[in-house]
Amino acid sequence: MATLFIADLHLCVEEPAITAGFLRFLAGEARKADALYILGDLFEAWIGDDDPNPLHRKMAAAIKAVSDSGVPCYFIHGNRDFLLGKRFARESGMTLLPEEKVLELYGRRVLIMHGDTLCTDDAGYQAFRAKVHKPWLQTLFLALPLFVRKRIAARMRANSKEANSSKSLAIMDVNQNAVVSAMEKHQVQWLIHGHTHRPAVHELIANQQPAFRVVLGAWHTEGSMVKVTADDVELIHFPF
């Protein structure tokens, strides 16, 4: 058996091929797993569980079917869907996890997270993140009419795209000191995360021992997952 990890699907109505690929994944590979972990940015945007977008209901039903089949499903918020709440989690059968979680997997201690908190060189993003994660601000935003939230979200995405276009690739990647600090804080030799869209397996030293950072790829023209078994930790890309 295996435990599966995915992230950064950025599901939206404008990308039906990705949605179709995810549905096939849920109906196939996911049903064979010990557990499925979604490490954020499942959706391109999330403005509240009350958004009647049919895509959201469709995805909730598909994930719920996996959960009902006996495969527990877990979710860590990303920078795009950090407002995904208890209502959607209940409808989809997912368990919401904190932004950093340590798992005991087949004899390994594995730290999982979305990954944006590791990009500490991007001071502008980290300041923005701290602001939008304030509970009072989230409560205020979610109390706004849906059409107002949609306008605000669209403006924020446009601003983010413009800001990122002028940033270096290095700034938007993880900070190595932040990586080591997180792994030593949790006393782990394995870290799995997404966010950067730079799939790879990196070797490093943490806790004065060899350690590994596995980065999930985004779902663009193919799927990406990490498959953890008793024998191996594999980063796998597969066609939709």
From Swiss-Prot:
CDD domains: MPP_YbbF-LpxH. SUPFAM superfamilies: Metallo-dependent phosphatases. Pfam families: Metallophos. The keyword Chaperone does not apply. The gene is lpxH. It is a peripheral membrane protein. The lineage of its organism: Bacteria, Pseudomonadati, Pseudomonadota, Gammaproteobacteria, Enterobacterales. Substrate binds at N79, R80, D122, S160, N164, K167, H195. Binds 2 Mn(2+) ions per subunit in a binuclear metal center. It catalyses: UDP-2-N,3-O-bis[(3R)-3-hydroxytetradecanoyl]-alpha-D-glucosamine + H2O = 2-N,3-O-bis[(3R)-3-hydroxytetradecanoyl]-alpha-D-glucosaminyl 1-phosphate + UMP + 2 H(+). This is UDP-2,3-diacylglucosamine hydrolase. GO terms for molecular function: manganese ion binding; UDP-2,3-diacylglucosamine hydrolase activity. Optimum pH is 8.0. The keyword GTP-binding does not apply. Belongs to the LpxH family. Mn(2+) 1 binds at D8, H10, D41, H197. Disruption phenotype: An insertion mutation defective in lpxH is not viable and accumulates UDP-2,3-diacylglucosamine. Its main location: membrane. Its cofactor is Mn(2+). One of its GO terms (biological process) is lipid A biosynthetic process. It is an enzyme of class 3 (hydrolase).
